[in-house]
Amino acid sequence: QLELPVKYAVYLIVTSGEASTTYLNFTTSEKTIQTMKHQYKFTNLGKRSLPISVVFWVPVRLNNEIVWDRPQVTFSPNLSSACNTEERSPPHSDFLAELEKTHVLNCSIAVCQRIACDIPYFNIQE
């Protein structure tokens, strides 16, 4: 077990925007395009700037059918960020059994895109 001394407190708040999509009903037989939008606000209430990493997991394919096409992450123009994207396969191969149990499409049954963004200097009250 390792120890890491903490020199100062970090006060970071993440809130979801009211304009975010909360629910989307779809079937794979329908080929209509629907737009989903999620907004998150990150607020640094601390006394100093700090580096942060933000990671998004987005289900993009289920049984070789596209469920979310070309997910994008954008930041406020005043933030400098670098994002890396990679696809990850699901740990469960029997997606039908999992969907019957939970009725939730997530990265345990779908191929997901992992989008990791590093923000080297997240200023106070940004």
UniProtKB/Swiss-Prot annotation:
Glycans are attached at residues 25, 78, 106. It is a single-pass type I membrane protein. InterPro entries: Integrin_dom_sf, ITGAX-like_Ig_3. GO terms for cellular component: membrane raft; plasma membrane. It is found in: Cell membrane; Membrane raft. One of its GO terms (biological process) is positive regulation of microglial cell mediated cytotoxicity. Heterodimer of an alpha and a beta chain. ITGAM associates with ITGB2. Found in a complex with CD177 and ITGB2/CD18. Interacts with JAM3. Interacts with THBD. Interacts with TMEM268; this interaction inhibits ITGAM degradation via the endosome-lysosome pathway. The integrin I-domain (insert) is a VWFA domain. Integrins with I-domains do not undergo protease cleavage. Belongs to the integrin alpha chain family. This is Integrin alpha-M. It comes from Cavia porcellus (Guinea pig).
